[in-house]
């Protein structure tokens, strides 16, 4: 079995699928399913559709962390609202770096929010859109006009951050980013390194 569509059914769990290692795509949208882990480590699995199910962000992040090559499509309406609210220059940056079309499909939107690397342009002033990129690992904000790192607070997968030549002065939003391994704050306005104490 390669494709399974159980959309709109009364199915509540996926435990009976755990041995189906040839599954490529599963659609469980509009169901009461909350747990994706029975699909964990299926080597051929590439997409899971779970809009309007009980699958939440915490479950999705856990599953993606364990299965980085699987695209999990969920909460698409909220994602589309976020995308439509972005300024056009942010859309250009994200579609260019995620290598998607300028009018991304729902699959491409989910690819965008799961990018691992991002470098922003020098004229960018607001980092808020980055807060949605919770799987990002390498972020380069150098030479930008960004002066506030607050949107980075929840980016727990961040490993490398470059804010060289910016007006950043406060590192407090980085204090809980336990995976951060590299930080470049050359030519910034940072005075205190105290927020880095427990990293």
Model-derived features with residue positions:
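N-terminal capping/linker segments that flank leucine-rich repeat
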Residues: 3, 16, 21, 38-140, ...
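Per-repeat beta-strand-to-loop junction in leucine-rich repeat
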Residues: 5-8, 27-30, 51-52, 75, ...
